[in-house]
């Protein structure tokens, strides 16, 4: 694999020499940073099992190497890397896998280690969604996830990835993560704080990542991280699990932040060692039981992961002074909810008791039941999935609901050919050789739902959302 030139400030190199253990050597670190990052993917087990995914992609000649800490994660090598971007493959478009850096799969693995099965989880810095979607898959779309993102421009990307992966148990918020400790104290069974950081571990992906690096900047970032972890710890219920992670390498933003929390609440913070998370953790394990992953250790991005438990209640923070505003939704009455469920089932959409229908004007939504305790405490950017819009003739089912709820085994499902599926993703109507019988057609490809179409004569009218329509080279170009 070709080398690339990484910019290293002298002060950074001095800091790394002091932070790095005696083995592996500092020269190994520098050499690893000059190598481009290996590509990696995570199979979305909400859509397909790992075994079925491997069978489906076997004809492509992809070399998939298992990632030790994530059984659904793989490093991927392709002979035709330049021929077709991974994001333009049919399997990616239908949400069967997520392009995710291997080391960024570590925090969620730690969150669910030792049989931990949380029902209400918060991801405090969630965009673009790799860890939120990984959490949802581990929860099998059950329970509730609050996914927060401070950057307004990234909330849209976060929602797009959640929708593509068929996730229904997520509520999105757009807040500074420092508000949650006061706003929702002791509300979450588990919290992931993948904290904003100096990004020292990502130089293999971005050789210029350290162009604006300085020790002073690290100190400012660490101060923010301490405020964030304090807020997260307040929002964690007694006995709950908090995972703190970064993609940086210095101790000030990593070990020191966790040690500060323990010094602040000495009787309430218990470090949970990660030595048994996967074979080979001893290469990255700190004396506190954290994982401090330098790039050369597992040939991935640099990363830090710590896991801790809240063992004692701590003093509450002052109640926030902001106003949430009126909640614009109302729960659907039981009788009408039954009618909606029956109508949805007729086009192949089904859901379990974890989701409950709510209404806003002519819009119908499905919210995870576990989020109801948070209504009135935070303002949501988006909640659950939009199921339908009502009109005089019935319901106009929404694309995100089809992706999350549809069963490809429904009697109105219609499997497209590769050429027809590509036309669908390009936003064009499809003219199948043998038209389906039903008027409302659940369009599938590779036995996966990709949309809902109206049959008009011999034509399937495309309903693929305009913002998702693709141009350029797609999967049949690589056939």
From Swiss-Prot:
EC nos: 2.1.1.178
Alphabetical list of InterPro entries matching this protein: Methyltr_RsmF_N, MeTrfase_RsmB-F_NOP2_cat, MeTrfase_RsmB-F_NOP2_dom, Nol1_Nop2_Fmu_2, Nop2p, RCMT, rRNA_ssu_MeTfrase_F, RsmB/NOL1/NOP2-like_CS
Active site as annotated: 247 (nucleophile)
GO CC term (a single one): cytoplasm
Pfam family, one: YebU_pre-PUA_dom
Reactions performed catalytically: cytidine(1407) in 16S rRNA + S-adenosyl-L-methionine = 5-methylcytidine(1407) in 16S rRNA + S-adenosyl-L-homocysteine + H(+)
An annotated GO BP: rRNA base methylation
One Gene Ontology MF term: rRNA (cytosine-C5-)-methyltransferase activity
SUPFAM superfamilies: S-adenosyl-L-methionine-dependent methyltransferases
Homology family: Belongs to the class I-like SAM-binding methyltransferase superfamily. RsmB/NOP family.
Role, per record: Specifically methylates the cytosine at position 1407 (m5C1407) of 16S rRNA.
Name this polypeptide is given: Ribosomal RNA small subunit methyltransferase F
Species annotation: Shigella dysenteriae serotype 1 (strain Sd197)
